[in-house]
């Protein structure tokens, strides 16, 4: 019989109660932990296949993250009333966890590992991604999966000059910094950050502050691991047959000849030809040669050759110095008709970005734990197969594309003007036309150009660069502007984006077991020099935002008192429909009374705005207005000063001379000048068309 026993550790991190519990739930998983920060609870499970897949050349890790609607007391929307495919937010949080734990698995491991995080309860204060990240770290620690080193993760905010560990949702709304860091006791393995143009010193200080919090959580996880006391499993890892590896290493000169070339296509062609030839040569010597093993050994020798070449020549495979950027090119407004466009080229990486401006009806509604908002700035990243010269099926955006799109969006979001300044919904799409490293940072640059091309009043350009790292024996070499080969064979992909004023986004992925803050400090310094050069090119392409395109809609924002919303809309939407018919402009009204008037011309928008303002306005006695006759009888007329806003005009108030019948002097549709003579307690109006008499002095 399975023994169920709650094994629990409790501590306090950032003034909040933290609990890790194991041994009672989900016991058929290799490891399962119920993690609780405050009243936000995640069940994190990890599973490992019993047998490795030795015929593949990668580590088969899958990470999923699910936010359950019941966690916040909601029933899912839609016809089926149940959770469906993961949202973009869930995918991004799954990637956050994946990137944190992937470097920690043993080299050569080929057992399938699946990580599943379910958010079971949420207090709307403590962000669940940090709970799930640490739940995963704890589940791996108590499992039999052979990860030798413990990790943990924290979020750091920066409010009023002070760092805040694991801030609440409310605190994050006030923070200049949203920094998520995962790491071991002494090194960092993952960073995801957005920042309001902060100085490098704030980020470096945030990383050091994060490490203190990480150690606190690791102490709790270590205590739980000791209490559970489960030994680690013995697994089979891929190891190279030494004789075959030595044979391949004897052909390092051929590797060098194929790899050392500045043109990506030429290099790939030469490497492909070498691979085919070497495989046939080795088959003759080693008849039992396994193709998957050959591919792994080939990649290992590639890595060794590239690193040795850099070490000995102090140059990179394309001839650049370690801190040298590839040739840059930027151009604005490259497409007709679209609201804005920008092209950015760095070496053999090329991105075309476009901007489309819309109204409030075009916003995206985000409904996630701790976040319900109308998202008015969206960036989407598209990576077609032709960008790498490959033939692949197209099946919608991949997790990678969603992740890259979000990174660019975060880098730009701090420069997007507020709704009060620019009442538009903004959609940016980045099309990767060529890829040879750091397409996300090229997308940031192209998007910055496109936004200014569209007339979005951004204060400054945003540029980005990807930094790499090569660890070779006792030396760490930081590389500026890594290309695809250096990303593939290197130890770090560190993306840094920002303006001339400061940093707006960071993203770090590593392939080693961690990187020191000192190395990252050096990389940020090197990135700032490169970013300055890139920004010069962006400003040369378009120094400031252009006027709105003629093809872009015209939008103005109006504040409507909440108690007047029904009056503006009218019965069955009659008033709004009529304004649209008469002016050609459309009106979107939010529940809080904020309205957006959208039209193709300034004239139509202003006409619609004036009509809305007249509906909302309470005319004062004596105020002169223009009215339209909507009904005429012999003794009185009904006149309208705005759609749905009418009053009475008596026959005696039309002329100083006697009129037998109003039907003789007025007709429906006629426009006349009137003034407010009376207004009763219910707001009903009586007008006069007589000339106003001057008050006696």
From Swiss-Prot:
SUPFAM superfamilies: Eukaryotic type KH-domain (KH-domain type I), Nucleic acid-binding proteins, Ribonuclease PH domain 2-like, Ribosomal protein S5 domain 2-like. Residues 553-612 form the KH domain. InterPro entries: ExoRNase_PH_dom1, ExoRNase_PH_dom2, ExoRNase_PH_dom2_sf, KH_dom, KH_dom_type_1, KH_dom_type_1_sf, NA-bd_OB-fold, PNPase. It is found in: Cytoplasm. Its main location: cytoplasm. SMART domains: KH, S1. It comes from the Bacteria. Involved in mRNA degradation. Catalyzes the phosphorolysis of single-stranded polyribonucleotides processively in the 3'- to 5'-direction. This is Polyribonucleotide nucleotidyltransferase. It comes from Coprothermobacter proteolyticus (strain ATCC 35245 / DSM 5265 / OCM 4 / BT). The gene is pnp.
């Amino acid at each position: 019989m399975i023994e169920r026993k709650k094994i629990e550790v409790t501590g306090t991190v950032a003034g909040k109660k933290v609990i890790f519990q194991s041994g009672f739930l989900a016991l058929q998983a290799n490891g399962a932990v119920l993690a609780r920060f405050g009243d936000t609870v995640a069940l994190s499970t990890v599973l490992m296949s019993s047998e490795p897949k030795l015929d593949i050349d990668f580590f088969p890790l899958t990470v999923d993250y699910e936010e359950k609607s019941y966690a916040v007391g909601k029933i899912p929307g839609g016809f089926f009333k149940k959770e469906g495919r993961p949202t973009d937010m869930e995918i991004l949080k799954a990637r956050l966890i994946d990137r944190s734990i992937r470097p920690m698995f043993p080299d050569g491991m080929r057992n399938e590992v699946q990580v599943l995080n379910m958010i079971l309860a949420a207090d709307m204060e403590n962000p669940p991604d940090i709970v799930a990240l640490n739940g995963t770290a704890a589940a791996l620690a108590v499992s039999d999966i052979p990860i030798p080193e413990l990790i943990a993760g924290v979020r750091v905010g920066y409010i009023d000059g002070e760092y805040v560990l694991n801030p609440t949702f409310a605190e994050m709304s006030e923070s200049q910094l949203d920094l998520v860091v995962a790491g071991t006791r002494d090194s960092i393995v993952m960073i995801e950050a957005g920042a309001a143009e902060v100085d490098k010193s704030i980020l470096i200080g945030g990383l050091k502050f994060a490490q203190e919090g990480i150690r606190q959580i690791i102490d709790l996880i270590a205590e739980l691991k000791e209490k559970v006391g489960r030994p680690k499993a013995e697994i089979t890892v891929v190891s190279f047959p030494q004789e075959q590896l030595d044979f391949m290493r004897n052909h390092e000169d051929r590797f060098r000849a194929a790899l050392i070339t500045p043109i990506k296509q030429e290099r790939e062609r030469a490497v492909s030809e070498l691979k085919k030839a070497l495989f046939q040569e080795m088959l003759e010597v080693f008849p039992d040669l396994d193709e998957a093993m050959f591919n792994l050994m080939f990649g290992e020798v590639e890595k060794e050759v590239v690193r040795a070449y850099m070490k000995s020549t102090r140059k990179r495979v394309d001839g650049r110095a370690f801190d040298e950027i590839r040739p840059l090119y930027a151009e604005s407004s490259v497409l007709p008709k679209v609201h804005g466009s920008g092209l950015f080229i760095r070496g053999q990486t090329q991105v075309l970005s476009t901007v489309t401006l819309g109204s409030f009806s075009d916003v995206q509604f985000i409904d996630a734990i701790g976040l319900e908002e109308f998202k008015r700035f969206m960036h989407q990243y598209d990576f077609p197969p032709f960008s790498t010269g490959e033939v692949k099926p197209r099946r919608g955006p991949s997790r990678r594309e969603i992740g890259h799109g979000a990174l660019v969006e975060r880098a730009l979001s701090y420069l997007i003007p507020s709704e009060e300044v620019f009442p538009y919904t903004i959609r940016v799409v980045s099309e990767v036309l060529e890829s040879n490293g750091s397409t996300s940072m090229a997308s940031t640059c192209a998007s910055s150009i496109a936004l200014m091309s569209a007339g979005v009043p951004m204060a400054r350009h945003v540029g980005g660069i990807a930094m790499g790292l090569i660890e070779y024996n006792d030396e760490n070499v930081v590389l500026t502007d890594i290309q695809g080969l250096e990303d593939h064979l290197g130890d770090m992909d560190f993306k840094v984006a920002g303006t001339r004023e400061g940093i707006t986004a960071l993203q770090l992925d590593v392939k080693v077991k961690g990187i020191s803050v000192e190395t990252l400090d050096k990389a940020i310094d090197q990135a700032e020099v490169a970013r300055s050069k890139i920004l010069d090119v962006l400003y040369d392409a378009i120094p400031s935002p252009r006027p709105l395109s003629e093809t872009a809609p015209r939008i103005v924002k109006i504040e409507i008192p909440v108690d007047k919303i029904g009056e503006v809309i009218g019965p069955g939407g009659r008033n709004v429909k009529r304004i649209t018919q008469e002016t050609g402009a459309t009106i979107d009204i939010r529940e809080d009374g904020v309205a957006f008037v959208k039209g193709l011309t300034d004239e139509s928008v202003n006409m619609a705005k004036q009509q809305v303002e007249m509906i909302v306005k309470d005319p004062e006695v004596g105020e002169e207005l223009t009215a339209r006759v909507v009904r005429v009888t012999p003794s009185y007329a009904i006149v309208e000063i705005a759609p749905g806003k009418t009053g009475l005009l008596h026959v005696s108030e039309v002329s100083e001379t006697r009129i037998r019948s109003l039907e003789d002097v007025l007709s429906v549709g006629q426009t006349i000048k009137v003034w407010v003579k009376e207004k009763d307690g219910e707001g009903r109006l009586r007008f006069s068309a007589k000339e106003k008499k001057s008050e006696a002095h």
